[in-house]
Amino acid sequence: MARLFTPSESKYYLMALDAGTGSIRAVIFDLEGNQIAVGQAEWRHLAVPDVPGSMEFDLNKNWQLACECMRQALHNAGIAPEYIAAVSACSMREGIVLYNNEGTPIWACANVDARAAREVSELKELHNNTFENEVYRATGQTLALSAIPRLLWLAHHRSDIYRQASTITMISDWLAYMLSGELAVDPSNAGTTGLLDLTTRDWKPALLDMAGLRADILSPVKETGTLLGVVSSQAAELCGLKAGTPVVVGGGDVQLGCLGLGVVRPAQTAVLGGTFWQQVVNLAAPVTDPEMNVRVNPHVIPGMVQAESISFFTGLTMRWFRDAFCAEEKLIAERLGIDTYTLLEEMTSRVPPGSWGVMPIFSDRMRFKTWYHAAPSFINLSIDPDKCNKATLFRALEENAAIVSACNLQQIADFSNIHPSSLVFAGGGSKGKLWSQILADVSGLPVNIPVVKEATALGCAIAAGVGAGIFSSMAETGERLVRWERTHTPAPEKHELYQDSRDKWQAVYQDQLGLVDHGLTTSLWKAPGL
């Protein structure tokens, strides 16, 4: 690709728009992958009265917030808009946007929208109860988070919107459209709709036909890193970017995060530790799990897919524990000028591996086909205050997060026959040195910690640079820009101890699921349609 910019002539930068579940960020990077500035705003999704589980995406307000973030990032960076060489967008997966035939966005929902539980149940009954299996084999997705039941819900309950709908995209594509006026989706994000074929990396309209839904709403598919268009004059006035700035196709947050971590080759493995924890393994060719426990998504690297297992609310559980039980530690940490989690890890380091047998019951390993969890609890507590205290419970939570990750990675190995030799640990969880070491000890693998731990925006910026002709290859650039802070090596004796802890936890968790099944306790989370 011919260069649109010549970086040697002046100082150019790249902008990434990162639309997460709870916030929107505009992040500016230099061409060496260094973060220069950020603009950020929280956003909230709208629960519709009398529509249980609904979480609509506020298109008008959220576009205003995105524009404010872009202006804020430019201001904080102290650079003129003409030095932004290109912009791209990434977003939470599963969130969808519908447009009418004039190109006006008319409806959107966030990834957490769970209104279509009844529709999921109805769809599962199609084709003699084989429809979900057919969707999974083709797309790597089940119906729980798919766009298909949401579209069916609109057909049932908001036929006015359903009839008007002319095009569907993801939220990252909506941001790019608002900037450029060009509509397209990329495989990595659109793959989470349950409508995109893993092998062809293109839509599979037959799935909509099978569900009795319209198949004429599917937008063009373009690979991540493709030049989509340029910032329009109208958008430039609102967001502060220069009209004519290249707008590049972005992608899904996890896949672009892996690009930013240099996880771009077959068999490379990452654990992304945020609100949810994703365990991701790169597969050289599309293959799905016969047990339907693991989702499979297109990578942003063409031809490659990612097996992904998800631990539910891992980071959120830690935050709950800190806020509910550690007010004293928060005050002490503030006086010491350190993070509360750092103080808790220092306290926890004196607790022996295995946490005196305490077993947290929060997220289960991923069971994509029948995805639900036990009621949150701690099992096997002691009334000895020297053995059972805040430090013990905190370590038990860190160990349990690592155990669930190891279970999820084992599920991927079982069907893919890929056994990684190491893994990358990123996201907020990787800031904890003890937690990183525990993950190494539990998994039995060396754990590499990057300097840039929140790598999604960096991966998005790399895509922008490829689309502008600044970088020649996403994979090579991702590998070149990633820098490593430290490596944690597993201790064999601790790994053996944790294997025993893992076996006991799995047996206890299965019993706890039985309490939910009998209506005696309330699940941490249950997928729509169960």
UniProtKB/Swiss-Prot annotation:
EC nos: 2.7.1.189
Single biological process term from Gene Ontology: carbohydrate metabolic process
Keywords assigned by UniProt, alphabetized: Cytoplasm, Kinase, Transferase
Subcellular location: Cytoplasm
Gene Ontology terms for molecular function: autoinducer-2 kinase activity
InterPro entries the UniProt entry points to: AI-2_kinase (IPR033676), ATPase_NBD (IPR043129), Carb_kinase_FGGY (IPR000577), FGGY_C (IPR018485), FGGY_Carb_Kinase (IPR050406), FGGY_N (IPR018484)
Function statement: Catalyzes the phosphorylation of autoinducer-2 (AI-2) to phospho-AI-2, which subsequently inactivates the transcriptional regulator LsrR and leads to the transcription of the lsr operon. Phosphorylates the ring-open form of (S)-4,5-dihydroxypentane-2,3-dione (DPD), which is the precursor to all AI-2 signaling molecules, at the C5 position.
Name of the protein in question: Autoinducer-2 kinase
Organism (species): Escherichia coli O9:H4 (strain HS)
Organism taxonomic ancestry: Bacteria, Pseudomonadati, Pseudomonadota, Gammaproteobacteria, Enterobacterales
